[in-house]
Amino acid sequence: MSSEQSDCWICQSLSRDPHLVYYETKTSLAKLNPDQLFQGYTFLTLKQHREHLHLLPENMRKQFLDDMLTVATALAKALNPDRLNYELLGNAQAHLHWHIIPRYISDPMWGRPIWAGNRPRRRLASEDYSRLKDTIQAHLPHPRTRKKTPLATQR
């Protein structure tokens, strides 16, 4: 199976918005959702185009799940949400990626799935994305694996 599929918008998104990337391993890439209505909302994407978790080779599956737990733990420590939601769907685009969504009692969708109906959007200024990434990165292990982005290196 090819590691990238030209018609997959998730494969294409791996190289977009490098300023939102805050963690990378050989298996996964973590980046902030541009919509930060839920502070810290992260996509953790498998770098290879694969569609089914249960069909991944064991070492890749373990690393992908470990990466998800590493990112979720960092989000919990950095942002202290009331809950963390984890979603691995594949209905809209069949490419393995986690939605890791910190939830707060004060959020406008509290008690409901974030997909329920229309919801407001929240874009941040570039310096606010950078601050948020720094806050999360402070709780990630192995600084040598952190992805340096052009925005982070300009400081």
Predicted regions and their residues:
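HIT superfamily nucleotide-processing domains
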Residues: M1-R155
